[in-house]
Amino acid sequence: MKILKMMAVAALFMPLLFSCSGGSSSKNNLLGAIPDQYAQFVEEKAQIKKEAENIKTAEDKKALIEKSEKMTAKWKEKIEESAKALSGKPIEIAECNFNVTEPMSLEFDDFFSKSDLKPKFNIKGTAIAKADTQTELNYVLKSIPVYLVGYDAEGKEVFKTKAGYVDVEDVNGKAFIKANTPVKFDPVRFGESDIEGSKTAKTYKLEVKE
C-alpha cells in the first residue's frame, strides 16, 4: 500500500518535474529546429562534395548534380518551414543596457545564399538605450553596431550576430549613447558557424561590443 501511494505521488509531480527541467532550454531556443537541420544539410553537402572527387564520366557528373539539387531542395523546404515557424515567437532579452519596449521576434525574409541555405530574418520589435552610456569606442561614425549575444548556462558567450546599430554622439573622442536612443535593426542571417552556439545559448542580450 505504501509503495502504491508513493507511485501515485510521483505520478502527480511528474508533469511538474518535466516542465521545470526543460522549460528554460526550450523557452530560449532562438532558432528552433534550424540548427539541427542546417547541421544535417552541411553534412550531406560535404558528402556530395566528397563523392565529386571520384567522378569519372559525364553520366556520373549529371547524376551527382541531380542528387545535389534534390538534396538542396529538400533542406530548403525544411529550413524555410522552420524559419517561418519562428515568426512572432518572442526573443527574451536578459537584463542589459537596452530596454525592449515592443517584443522582439524573428521574421523569415529569404535566403542570403540559395546554395548555402543561410536564412535571412528581419527583427521585429523595438529596443532603446536604457540610460546615457559612455563607451570606450573611438568616435568614428555617427552610429555603432549592436549585437544579439547569447550566453550559455555558465555565462560564457557562445553566440553573436550583428542585430543593427544605434546612433551615437562624440564626447571627448568617444562614442556616447544617449538614453532612449532606439536600436535600428538590420536583417540577420544564420550560418554554419552559428550552429553550436545557438543550440547552447540560454540567455540573450543586446550589446555594444568594445
Q: Can you describe what each PLM-predicted range is?
A:
Residues N138-V146:
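Short coil-to-beta strand junction motifs in C2/discoidin
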Residues A127-L137:
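Short amphipathic, basic-aromatic surface patches that mediate peripheral association
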Residues M1-A8:
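Bacterial N-terminal signal peptides that target proteins for export
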Residues S21-G23:
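Bacterial signal peptide processing site
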Residues L17-S19:
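C-terminal motif of bacterial Sec signal peptides marking the signal peptidase cleavage site
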Residues T135-L137, D152-K202, K209:
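Short, solvent-exposed, Trp/other aromatic-anchored flexible loops in extracytoplasmic proteins
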Residues K67-N122:
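Transition segment at domain starts
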Residues K49-L64:
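Charged, low-complexity interaction regions
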